[in-house]
UniProtKB/Swiss-Prot annotation:
Reaction proceeds by a ping-pong mechanism involving intermediate methylation of a conserved cysteine residue. The lineage of its organism: Bacteria, Pseudomonadati, Rhodothermota, Rhodothermia, Rhodothermales. It comes from Salinibacter ruber (strain DSM 13855 / M31). Specifically methylates position 2 of adenine 2503 in 23S rRNA and position 2 of adenine 37 in tRNAs. PROSITE patterns: RADICAL_SAM. Residues 118-354 form the Radical SAM core domain. Its EC number is 2.1.1.192. This is Probable dual-specificity RNA methyltransferase RlmN.
Length: 369
């Protein structure tokens, strides 16, 4: 390929070629070096693919013609596109993306609107997988099962395109990213880390790592890996119950000893000791399941060992699932107990419910089993 001579520049089939969007900067530099080109050509490729959004090798004008021919033969740049878009009454936007495999993933743009009607913050909720293997009993995505891991480029493209949507609808770029869409991010660990590296690169979207939150059901080993890899992103743990018995009933991942509450606590202790970063706990309230005052006190005991905050969510109903949202009165009592126990707590109000874009509702209805 690259700067070396080639016997032929016949374009191979898509199956034969390497998708450059499976790689970040380091991977692109390795790729060109393995094909005989200087490593700086990988930096140039990165700028074209992730900085300018160019997938046509002929347009990459600072690459030698011979290298462009080699890339056409050996590589491809697989983009994903929005095939459907909806806007909710609260101005939340949900987009459906088609992947190269033909499967689809959903992404949500969530505006925080101020008193003047302007968006002071624009958050993209990205998917890291199609479907999810975790099987949480209350989640629409979990009912799908696992279908496909997204590449770093497919994760990046969600933000790239939603950034364009943000400019179109709100006149400003995306400010925050949360890995809280379809899938368990830490089960697609390498691709998620590569995508974060791309998104925060100054030659790409140049987003702040401190504006990115990675959410997990609590995969203990991978939480330790996050600590070791020294990401400056935020960590959110989908807790949803303060005791092993209840959590195992609604979140099957908790049944295994290595991902149970004690194992999770030990991993979070490791994470905090290594990073010193505050931990966020996500806690969705289900009527009669985890919303009692005793549950609130137990939640305080589970979370206050280190600087943390608790985000309370009201359940977003999913057709066919036997969960109900707690009452506003019970929510108020729950909050009151947490505050009395010294817990920092925020009530997160759902956005985009009328277009099934709220937490736990992402599941493309057209997806075959």
């Amino acid at each position: 390929m690259p700067d070396v001579k080639t016997a032929s520049h016949t374009v191979g089939t898509a199956e034969d070629r390497v998708d450059l969007k499976t790689m970040g900067r380091a991977g692109l530099k390795d790729f060109v070096a393995e094909h005989g080109a200087p490593r700086y050509r990988g930096d140039q490729l990165f700028n074209w693919v992730y900085g300018k959004g160019v997938s046509d090798f002929d347009r990459m004008s600072n690459l030698p013609k011979r290298m462009r021919r080699g890339l056409q033969r050996d590589a491809t740049v697989e983009d994903i596109e929005i095939v459907e878009q909806q806007q909710a009454a609260d101005r939340t936007v949900k987009a459906l993306f088609e992947l190269p495999s033909g499967r689809e993933a959903e992404t949500v743009l969530i505006p925080a609107i101020d008193e003047r009607g302007e968006a002071r913050r624009l958050t993209v909720c990205v998917s890291s997988e199609v479907g999810c293997a975790m099987g949480c009993e209350f989640c629409a995505t979990g009912r799908m099962g696992f279908r496909e891991n997204l590449t770093p480029g497919a994760i990046f493209d969600q933000v790239w395109h939603m950034n364009e949507v943000a400019q179109e609808h709100f006149g400003r770029p995306v400010t925050n990213i949360v890995f809280m869409g379809m899938g368990e991010p830490l089960l697609n660990y390498d691709a998620v880390l590569d995508s974060i590296s791309i998104l925060t690169d100054e030659d790409s979207l140049n987003l702040s790592a401190q504006k990115i939150t990675v959410s997990t059901v609590g995969l203990a080993r991978r939480i330790k890996d996050l600590a070791d890899d020294q990401l400056r992103t935020n960590l959110a743990v989908s807790l949803h119950a303060p005791d092993n018995e209840t959590r195992s009933r609604i979140m099957p991942v908790n049944e295994a000893e290595k991902t149970s509450l004690p194992a999770l606590k030990e991993a979070l202790q490791y994470y905090f000791d290594k990073t010193g970063r505050q931990i966020t706990y996500e806690y969705c309230l289900f009527k009669g399941v985890n919303d009692s005052e005793t549950d609130a006190r137990n939640l305080a005991d589970v979370t206050r060992w280190a600087p943390s905050k608790v985000n309370l969510l009201m359940y977003n109903p999913v057709e066919g699932l036997n969960f109900e949202r707690t009452s506003e009165a019970q929510l108020d009592r729950f909050v009151q107990v947490l505050v009395q126990e010294g817990v920092t707590v925020t009530v997160r109000r759902s956005r985009g419910q009328d277009i099934d874009a709220a937490c736990g509702q992402l599941a493309n209805e057209g997806e075959d089993a």
